[in-house]
Amino acid sequence: MNQNLLVTKRDGSTERINLDKIHRVLDWAAEGLHNVSISQVELRSHIQFYDGIKTSDIHETIIKAAADLISRDAPDYQYLAARLAIFHLRKKAYGQFEPPALYDHVVKMVEMGKYDNHLLEDYTEEEFKQMDTFIDHDRDMTFSYAAVKQLEGKYLVQNRVTGEIYESAQFLYILVAACLFSNYPRETRLQYVKRFYDAVSTFKISLPTPIMSGVRTPTRQFSSCVLIECGDSLDSINATSSAIVKYVSQRAGIGINAGRIRALGSPIRGGEAFHTGCIPFYKHFQTAVKSCSQGGVRGGAATLFYPMWHLEVESLLVLKNNRGVEGNRVRHMDYGVQINKLMYTRLLKGEDITLFSPSDVPGLYDAFFADQEEFERLYTKYEKDDSIRKQRVKAVELFSLMMQERASTGRIYIPVSYTHLRAHETDQSRM
């Protein structure tokens, strides 16, 4: 190894490469680990050094060299690589390995517009100093390499264009706790902050990505998911699409209750036109979901819900699978098929399920969620009404199709729209 190589430091100055310094960092990172070879990591990384290399690139090269050695026979390389990555992240965030005081860090980040100023409005300097005593930065060293990469990619506050990192893991955890308990009584809230911090930083509980990445920022993302109720009018459908884009950009996962949309061929404006059905509007929602990312953290994601008795259900159940063509598939959302006790009962008795367009059966969709007895009364009434468009399908065939698609895609969910379902009311042993 040529010890006359020049390296470019983070401040732009240059100096000769210091191999002893690299060795000391590796020695520190390997402490207490089993079956790891520092010299092996050094050999793999040294051959990639060149004159003028940045110190940050040296660090990333060493991290990759350690990560490449992870194997079933030598799993501790994952912790060696993780510790090196933590060291690198802290240097990027703070310019040094030791994190600053929590209060000083929060003040700086609020001034930069990276943290929500409510943190300084809700808590005093003394409270931040007390929170600082709760923090155990050594917990960073328990991460595996995969966990550190997840942390860096999804959760740490950062500039996703330039790659600048602004915090380390323990500040993330303590500030999420501070945000979540800020409205608790002053005399007890720090106890909750400490207990929550200890639980989340030792992996006893996990948090949704939107909260982990956004709750302490000006976005103030306290909810991980948003349910949007879509009506049957164009105004409501377009408002739903607009809300999807807005909430996806705010890091929220999306639930779309789209069961009110009328079926293909239904009359519009008294027969002036006929309806194009659900699928074009589902595609519209899918485009909205994928139009922007969840605050740069990950792509937008949505689950769309509709009732099992919808007239188009047989076409909707297959939207996720890999058969068919783009025109009759909407593959980039997940789906929830809403069922209730009556659907189960028809299955167990070997009877038919009758499919309707929600626009043709007034009150049925509302009763489906609000009053099961009223739903059953209306459902049987509409089944007998020959003036209403309908289709009868064997319950076992419909349930079989649903379960086949659920098994093949893994992304069809089955919420039961009956909160008082009891085991003795439906013989579930026959399911």
Region spans (language model):
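Often metal-dependent polyanion-binding catalytic scaffolds in large enzymes
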Residues: 1-19, 23-166, 391, 403
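Structured core elements
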Residues: 6, 16, 226-228, 255-257, ...
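Generic, well-ordered alpha-helical scaffold segments in large soluble proteins
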Residues: 25, 29, 44, 48, ...
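Flexible, glycine/charged-enriched surface loops at secondary-structure junctions
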Residues: 36-42, 56, 72-80, 187-192, ...
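Conserved, charged catalytic cores of large soluble enzymes
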Residues: 96-158, 164-186, 261, 270-284, ...
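Long, structured ligand/cofactor-binding scaffold of large enzymes
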Residues: 143, 149-286, 290
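Conserved small/polar residues in nucleotide/adenosyl-binding loops
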Residues: 419-426
